Swiss-Prot record:
PANTHER family: ANKYRIN REPEAT DOMAIN 36-RELATED, ANKYRIN REPEAT DOMAIN-CONTAINING PROTEIN 26-RELATED
Composition bias type Basic and acidic residues, residue spans: 367-381, 505-516, 524-538, 585-601
Protein name per UniProt: Ankyrin repeat domain-containing protein 26
Broad class of where this protein is predominantly found: cytoplasm
GO cellular component: actin cytoskeleton; cytosol
Length: 1581
């Protein structure tokens, strides 16, 4: 029962071996669920390191301490390849996870099972850890060893929130594991409905396919196709009787086949609908009423449901249990108890545990197109009632997806029976008892919607006979039950593709059977016998058929199992006239005979009717038709008339033996025998002889008809199968084509891969060559960079030394502060102890004073006695001296002595009395003291209670303060962490800067490479130009040769002509020859002279170029020296700025120290006042003082931490500023290096040009020398050649000198660059050392902090012990002097209260005063800053205005002087014009003045001006002068405006500090001088 109603089978888990069931962890794998493996790790101390132990326990502080000390890294692994992150996620420690993630651990690290930390977090259902990992970029699509992702585990654990987070972080919803299961398939397989709906909402693919290719969408598609086929057929209202039970048994969507292979063994009870038996009973009654309304009345023997049947039915159900077959009964509405279901399910479980493949048989019919349902209308009317009673919806009457799929695949025998309303009750019971193997239990009857079906095979051989399959298959076949139980009929595999699958009933035959059975006439029996004979003659080849069709018998379905035989279909009810009493007798006979069979009801009926038991089960063996019978769809004719009754009976017995055979032989045989006709004939003869009942004859007839119908159905089914085979063949061919195409594509890809690999090899070789070139360039650049770094380090070494000194001074000051604070604490504790000692001493002094007073009294008494004795002795002496006087007085002395004795005795008695009185008084005093002590103690108790209450309130307040202090401490720790993170970020920034430097170097290298490429290109161009030059030279030579040849030809012709005319003109020829020679010589001389002039010009050009080159070299040197001087000046300025800044910092530090001293003095004064007050309040506020001391320690610790944090921030700011300065210096050095490289390249280019020109000149000189050697030169020409050679040698010397200078400059540049690089490298190393020192300082501070805490704890413990001891002593002393201190305590309390109130008021006043003072100081500072700004602005405005005024005044003076000069000049010009008649056009002003207007007046011609035209010329001159005045004024105004704008911009750039007044004045004077110089240059003022 447990396995059917929701418990899982012992099948394998759908996911990998890393997952197992656990209380709070998700586990699943390929191994069994009872495995020992757990998703959480098994921890062994030997396997793990320190950080792994701390992470598994969740000790954040320990993990942080280990990481700070560097004992182990963040990504260290243990012996099982687990990181600390794995363990923290597996055991759910989010704080450790955040710490490790912030330390930039490897998030996607894998353990030995190749699972990441995210997978472990999801598997162990640690949502917080998984969220942290996802937020920090963990990959949700990583697979473990079994191919499962984190989403698989989230789906398996039904954790929708985790799945939503994973999908939000781009998890692959279609990821497949090694079993080809997506998360959707896994959810469906594990029957997790909630997560399936969630995945469908998230748009998961419903068309996913697993390893076996099964797909739920196929079932839905086939179900839709079946609905179309059913809707296409018309429905007859007359077929209600046949479809009566189908309304109960139609499976709904929930009864469909499982969607995965795991559901074959998975019996979950998650969605189990509860069955309401009262609703079932009411639905059954309603169905009976509807049946009677439709006109179907049952007979008294079999139609009425009596209560007497229920015990017999239950007995039948109980008798079946020990049988090896599995039978599941449906619930009966008459018996409202699910006992038969439980028994049946137990049997079903036994079959599953034995490994049997359960095949459920269901009686279903396959009618032709013309045979339709009769009770369809009644079924529609009662559909909602029955479904609601069974716990199903209205949709459950629809076809299941499995029905449509199994249509074309079922090849089993099916008998179309007639379900009549007058069915026999015994027949019903017998039909129900003939369920073979396991009947299908729908969700409404079995108690579970998720009752898992049998497994589908790859070929989808659903419903095929066992004989045609190589291995046993699992099928689900549904059956109708015709008892008083709730009838349930499921449509399954045997439903046709286009036919409406209903049970067929024949009301006419039913009515005939009723008439013949009731009347009992022999005529009807004879007719039946004749019909039977006719049938035996016609339908001989039909096998053992199912004769229960009249009672709504079921279809014949082949069953298979490992331990089950192939069973015959369920037979229909036999005799119509049998009553319930006979059925009870038969059941008792079965119990007495202990007849163990799978169909007890059928055997009982066969015994009653005399039918041999082997006659009917023959169909069980022959239920799987042979291949020949299926293909031909016709029976093989066999003669049955030759056999006798005995042979028929023996055949029936043999058939029964075949029926009880094991299914193993049936599953092994591939071809079974077809239906045997002899069994049918024997049954007919047996019925004819022994059972003269019309109902049995009618059953035989109906069986024959149903056999014929089955043959027709098999034909259609075979046609469907052939069509499906053809489709499968076409699919197979298409797949083969696709495979061939894929293979071709693979081959192409491989060829392409080979080609790409070859190209890669080539590219790698080329890259290697390029890398070698780059290495050579990198080495050069590295050398230059090293030199620059060295120079930068030298510059920064001094700065770092100063900073280190400042840091050491700060650390020393901090240490002094901490030591002072500790000393103050120790002094306060000592003062408290001294106060307590002084109090004790005062008490003791009081006691000593009392004792001293008593002793003084006693001493006074003794002194009086001594005086008396001394007086007596004096009197005796006097008596000796004055015997004569004493003799008189001896009597008196004796009397006095007697009196003295009496007095002494009286005194002694008085003393005794006084002592007694004193004792009594002491006793009374003791009693009184006791009473007083009791009163004091009671009052003390009251006071202590009050004090306790006060202290409790104080403790609560202190707790709140402690909580706030702890919160502050936590904030400080977070601030510390933030500082560490900031430090790490600074370090990362430093590394980034380093990377940028490297990147800049790589860019420089690339630039060098580009420049080298450009040089190579220019060299190529030069080579090409040289080649062209050589070609042109060759062409010129060829042309000269051609000219020479032409000249030779001409000379030859001339010679010939001359020889011809030699006879006539000898003399003329000679003269012409001499003349020609002279002309040629002259021409050659002219050519030589022109060439000499050209050479001179070239030499002059070369000399000019050399001079220009010298000038450029000098300019470059000057520029380089200027750059060096600027760099030195900048370094000096930087050093001066640093010194000024250091001085300012020192002054600020001194000022801060003074303020600290003032604060400390104020604190000391306040502490003196507070101590004076605390001395009076010490007795009542001891505990309060302890708590305040602890709070003060925490506050001091907090202040120390804050100061340390500030120092660290300052140091970080300094480091950042240093880094920025180093970057700026590095950039400047790189910029200078680039400039120098550019200059060097330019020099090299000029050098190459000069070399080319020198080569050309040398070549030309050589040519000239050759030409001159040919021609006989004169002495002047020789001298010229010598001069040329000397010039050539001088030029070569100058070129050598220039080369030497350029090499020297290059060396100097390299040296400077190397120095700068060295400085930069030193600065970098010093920065790294500072970082290391800071780290060590942080660690030392941590250690010192821990030591200080330990010391503080020890001091507190000692102080507590001392205080406890002293308190004990004080308590004892107070007990002794309680009475004397009552008044003092009251007075003290009053005084303390008054003093407290006064002190509190005073403290508040002081605090308010301090706050006011601070506010006033802040306000004063703000106002001072405002006034300073205003003053500076006014000062600047005044300066600008004064400068403007001065400039304008100067310019006005200059303009006035100019005007005076111009007026004088004009007067002189007018005087000259008036005197001279011929006037030249005046060039107004000098050439320098013409620069103002950028134009010059060129005198044209001498203009003759008459005397009469003097007045208009004077007017023109005046007009011209006025124009000049206007233009001068305009230009002056422009220059003034520009000067004022420049000055204002310069003043804006000046720093706003008030200390820069002198510098601003200097700048103003410089600017004014520059402006005056400009005006002088432009206007010659």
């Amino acid at each position: 029962m447990k396995k059917i109603f929701g418990f899982r089978s012992k099948g394998p888990s759908p996911l990998g071996p890393s997952a197992r069931p656990r209380s709070n962890c998700v586990g699943f794998g390929r191994e069994s669920a009872s495995g020992s493996h757990v998703p959480r790790y098994h921890i062994h101390d030997k396997d793990m390191g320190k950080i792994h132990k701390a992470a598994s326990v969740g000790d954040v502080a320990k993990v942080q301490h280990i990481l700070i000390l560097g004992k182990s890294g963040v990504n260290d692994r243990d012996k099982k390849d687990r990181t600390a992150l794995h363990l923290a996620c597996a055991y759910g420690h989010p704080e450790v996870v955040t710490l490790l993630v912030e330390r930039k651990c490897e998030i996607d690290a894998r353990d030995s099972e190749s699972s990441t930390a995210l997978i472990k977090a999801v598997q162990c259902q640690e949502e917080e850890c998984a969220a942290i990992l996802l937020d920090h970029g963990a990959d949700p699509n990583v697979m473990d060893s079994s191919g499962n992702t984190a989403l698989h585990y989230a789906v398996y654990s039904e954790n929708t929130s985790m799945a939503a987070k994973l999908l939000a972080h781009n998890a692959n919803i279609e990821a497949k594991n090694k079993d080809d299961l997506t998360p959707m398939l896994l959810a469906v397989k594990e029957n997790k409905q909630h997560i399936v709906e969630f995945l469908v909402k998230k748009k998961a693919s419903i068309h996913a396919v697993d390893q076996l290719g099964s797909n739920r969408q196929m079932f839905e598609y086939d179900g839709k196709r079946l609905q179309r086929s059913e809707n296409s057929n018309p429905v007859d209202n007359g077929s209600e009787d046949g479809s009566l039970t189908r309304s109960y048994n139609t499976p709904g969507p929930a009864d469909s086949w499982p969607t995965s292979d795991e559901e074959d063994y998975n019996f979950d009870n998650k969605n189990v609908p509860k069955i309401n038996l009262t609703e079932l009973w009411t639905a059954a009654q309603q169905s009976r009423k509807n049946q009677t309304k439709c006109g179907f009345e049952e007979l008294d023997n079999g139609a009425r449901f009596d209560d007497s049947d229920s015990p017999s039915e239950s007995e039948d159900a109980i008798e079946v249990e020990p049988a090896p077959s599995v039978r599941v009964q449906t619930l009966s509405p008459s018996r409202q108890s699910p006992d038969p279901v439980e028994g049946a399910t137990e049997l079903a479980i036994e079959g599953e545990e034995n490994g049997t493949d359960v095949i459920e048989s269901a009686s279903q019919e396959q009618p032709n197109h013309d045979n339709l349902t009769r009770a369809d209308g009644w079924h529609k009317s009662n559909k909602s009632e029955m479904m609601s009673a069974l716990g199903l919806g209205e949709d459950e009457d629809e076809d299941s997806p499995w029905d449509s799929e199994s249509i074309s695949e079922s090849v089993s025998l099916k008998d179309v029976g007639h379900f009549s309303g007058t069915a026999d009750q015994t027949g019903k019971r017998r039909a129900h008892g003939q369920i073979e193997d396991v009947t299908y239990i729908p969700s409404c009857m079995s108690g579970s919607r998720n009752f898992k079906m049998a497994k589908l095979e790859e070929s989808r051989n659903v419903g095929l006979p066992v004989a045609h399959m190589e291995a046993p298959r699992k099928y689900v076949i549904m059956e109708p039950t015709i008892e008083r139980r709730a009838p349930v009929l499921n449509k399954t595999e045997t439903v046709g593709m286009t036919d409406a699958q209903t049970f067929k009933s024949e009301p006419e035959s039913v009515s005939r059977e009723e008439q013949t059975r009731l009347s009992g006439s022999e005529d009807s029996q004879q007719k039946v016998e004749e019909k039977r004979k006719y049938k035996n003659n016609e339908a001989e080849p039909s096998g053992n058929l199912y004769s229960g069709a009249a009672d709504g018998g079921a279809d014949v379905k082949p069953q298979s199992g490992d331990t089950e035989n192939q069973q015959s279909p369920r037979e229909g009810s036999e005799g119509r006239g049998s009553g319930p009493a006979l059925l009870m007798k038969e059941a008792k006979k079965m119990e007495n005979e202990k007849w163990v069979s799978r169909e007890p009801a059928r055997t009982a009926m066969s015994e009653r009717t005399g039918l041999p038991t082997g006659g009917w089960p023959q169909m069980q063996d022959g239920s799987c038709w042979s291949d020949t019978d299926q293909s031909e769809a016709r029976p093989t004719k066999k003669t049955s008339s030759k056999h006798n009754k005995d042979s028929g009976q023996t055949a029936a017995v043999d058939n029964l033996d075949d029926f009880t055979e094991s299914s193993e032989t049936a599953s092994e045989d591939h071809e079974l025998q077809g239906p045997d006709s002899e069994s049918i004939l024997c049954a007919i003869e047996h019925l004819r002889l022994e059972c003269k009942d019309t109902a049995s004859l009618l059953k035989i007839r109906d069986a024959v008809y149903s056999y014929k119908r089955l043959i027709e159905l098999k034909r259609s089914h075979c046609e469907l199968l052939t069509g499906k085979l053809k489709r499968m063949e076409n699919k197979y061919k298409g797949l083969q084509k696709e495979m061939s195409e894929t293979e071709e594509v693979k081959s192409r890809l491989e060829h392409e891969k080979v080609g790409w690999e070859q190209e890669l090899c080539r590219l790698r070789f080329a890259l290697k060559q390029e890398e070698e070139k780059r290495r050579s360039a990198d080495q050069l650049s590295e050398k230059t960079m090293e030199q620059l770094r060295r120079k930068g380090e030298q510059c920064q070494s001094e700065v770092e030394a100063r900073q280190q000194l400042e840091a050491s001074l700060r650390t020393l000051e901090m240490e002094l502060k901490t030591v002072k604070s500790h000393l103050n604490q120790v002094l306060e504790e000592r003062n408290e102890t001294q106060r307590q000692l002084s109090r004790e001493q005062n008490a003791r002094m009081l006691q000593d004073g009392i004792l001293a007073s008593h002793l003084c009294k006693q001493k006074e008494i003794e002194m009086t006695q001594k005086k008396m004795t001394s007086e007596v002795s004096v009197s005796h002496e006097k008596e000796k001296d004055l015997l004569h006087k004493n003799q008189r007085l001896q009597d008196e002395v004796a009397v006095l002595r007697l009196e003295m004795d009496t007095i002494k005795s009286h005194n002694q008695e008085k003393e005794k009395r006084y002592l007694e009185d004193i004792k009594i008084a002491n006793e009374k005093n003791d009693n009184l003291q006791r009473m007083v002590k009791l009163n004091m103690l009671s009052s003390k108790l009251d006071n202590e209670k009050q004090n306790k209450e006060r202290l409790e309130t104080d403790v609560e307040s202190f707790r709140s303060r402690l909580a706030s202090a702890l919160h502050d401490h936590a904030e400080i720790q977070t601030a510390k962490r933030d500082l560490e993170i900031a430090f790490q970020r600074a370090r990362d920034e430093w590394f980034r800067v380093k990377d940028k430097m490297n990147f800049d170097m790589s860019n420089l290298r690339d630039n060098n490479e580009v420049l080298s490429q450009q040089l190579s290109k220019t060299e190529r161009k030069l080579n090409s130009l040289e080649i062209e030059f050589h070609h042109t030279k060759d062409e010129l030579r060829e042309k000269t040769l051609a000219l020479k040849h032409a000249q030779r030809d001409l000379s030859q012709t001339q010679c010939q002509m001359k020889e011809v005319e030699h006879m006539f003109q000898d003399e003329q020829g000679k003269v012409s020859k001499f003349m020609g020679k002279q002309e040629s010589i002259e021409e050659r001389l002219a050519q030589l002279q022109s060439e000499n002039t050209l050479l001179r010009q070239q030499l002059d050009d070369a000399a000019n170029k050399a001079e220009s080159k010298d000038k450029t070299i000098v300019n470059i040197q000057d520029q380089f020296q200027d750059v060096l001087t600027r760099f030195q000046a900048e370094s000096q300025r930087h050093s001066l700025r640093l010194e000024d800044r250091n001085q300012e910092l020192v002054s600020e530090c001194s000022h801060l120290r003074e303020r600290l001293c003032q604060y400390e003095n104020e604190k000391a004064e306040r502490e003196v006042v507070v101590r004076q007050l605390q001395q009076e309040l010490a007795d009542t506020l001891k505990k309060q003082s302890m708590s305040e001391a602890s709070l003060e320690v925490s506050s001091r610790y907090r202040s120390n931490l804050e100061e340390e944090a500030r120092d660290l921030k300052k140091k970080l700011g300094q480091l950042r500023s240093q880094l920025q300065e180093a970057r700026d210096q590095h950039r400047e050095a790189v910029h200078h290096a680039e400039k120098m490289e550019d200059h060097l390249q330019k020099l090299e280019l000029e050098k190459s040009k000069f070399e080319i020109t020198i080569k050309k000149q040398s070549e030309e000189i050589d040519q000239l020398q050759e030409n001159l050697s040919r021609v006989n030169l004169s002495e002047e020409d020789k001298e010229k050649l010598q001069k040329l050679t000397e010039l050539k040698e001088s030029l070569e010397c100058t070129v050598d000198q220039e080369q030497k200078r350029s090499s020297a400059l290059e060396k100097e540049l390299m040296r400077t660059i190397q120095k700068k690089c060295g400085k930069l490298e030193k600065n970098k190393k010093q920065l790294e050392q500072e970082v290391v020192n800071l780290r060590s300082h942080m660690e030392k501070n941590m250690v010192e902090h821990s030591q200080a805490q330990q010391y503080a704890r020890e001091v507190e413990e000692r102080a507590r012990q001392d205080l406890v001891e002293k308190l004990k002593q004080v308590n004892l002393f107070l007990q002794a002097q309680a009475a004397s201190q009552e008044s003092l305590e009251q007075l003290r309390e009053n005084s303390n209260a008054s003093v407290r109130s006064q002190m509190e008021l005073r403290i508040k006043d002081l605090e308010s005063q301090l706050y006011r003072m601070k506010a006033q100081e802040d306000f004063d500072k703000i106002e001072l800053e405002k006034y300073k700004q205003l003053y500076q602005e006014e000062f600047r405005a005044r300066k600008s205005l004064s400068s403007k005024l001065n400039k304008t005044s100067e310019k006005l003076e200059e303009a006035s002087s100019k005007l005076l000069l111009e007026e004088q000049q004009n007067r002189s010009l007018l005087s000259t014009l008036s005197t001279r008649p011929v006037v030249e056009c005046p060039c107004v002003g000098s050439l320098h003045n013409s620069l103002v207007f950028n134009r010059t007046l060129i005198p044209r011609e001498n203009i003759v001006v008459p005397t009469s035209g003097l007045q208009p010329s004077n007017k023109r001159v005046e007009i011209y002068l006025t124009k000049m005045h206007q233009e001068l004024e305009k230009s002056i105004n422009r220059e003034l405006k520009e000067a004022t704008a420049e000055l204002e911009s310069e003043f804006c750039r000046v720093s706003p500090l008030g200390s820069a007044t002198k510098a601003s004045q200097d700048q103003l004077s410089d600017a004014s001088q520059e402006f005056i110089d400009i005006l002088k240059k432009k206007y010659m003022i």
